[in-house]
Amino acid sequence: MNIIRKLKPGTISLVLGPMFAGKTTFLIHCIYMLERLEKKVVFIKSTKNTRDKTIKTHSGIQLQSKQCEIIESTQLSDVGSLTDIHAVVIDEAHFFDDLIKCRAWADEEKIIILAGLNASFEQKMFQPIVHIFPYCSWIKYIGRTCMKCNRHNACFNVRKNADKTLILAGGSELYVTCCNNCLKKQMY
């Protein structure tokens, strides 16, 4: 199915999944499609994500766009005017406590596309994601295979160290995504 048919002005689309599932890759694909339709796109990333200043996936895929503006912010309410923008794309949406701000942008007839984790390392949903759910006209779940057994669908994000900080940006050096069987066996 062509995703572009789902991305309508005034709607919020949400892409969820565990780490390393391809959510950012999906967003990059959406940005390219929107740009082909001559839509002005802004990509918002959290300053809490300290891994890279560009739009780049864990697997190294990087957005190659001269038109897409990248905004780094701690809160969405700090983002300036988006008057001339057609689409707002937000990666790591769970990092934004004021994710509900997207509703106001949707009311301004902007296309909103969010990507975030399905759950924390404690296997609990992030509250900003929970609060935006009722306003999403389309929700997509992207899964991946367990990084330990390579047999089952993985939906659990597990931190490799004992740090209990809720938000701790990192990649495979800090996290593993595993299935329920490996989580129960603590095979990470």
Curated annotation (Swiss-Prot):
SUPFAM superfamilies: P-loop containing nucleoside triphosphate hydrolases. One of its GO terms (biological process) is thymidine metabolic process. It catalyses: thymidine + ATP = dTMP + ADP + H(+). The active site is at E92. ATP binds at G17, P18, M19, F20, A21, G22, K23, T24. Its EC number is 2.7.1.21. GO terms for molecular function: ATP binding; metal ion binding; thymidine kinase activity. Belongs to the thymidine kinase family. Phosphorylates thymidine. ASFV replicates in the cytoplasm of infected cells and contains genes encoding a number of enzymes needed for DNA synthesis, including thymidine kinase. Important for growth in swine macrophages in vitro and is a virus virulence factor in swine. This is Thymidine kinase. It comes from African swine fever virus (isolate Tick/Malawi/Lil 20-1/1983) (ASFV).
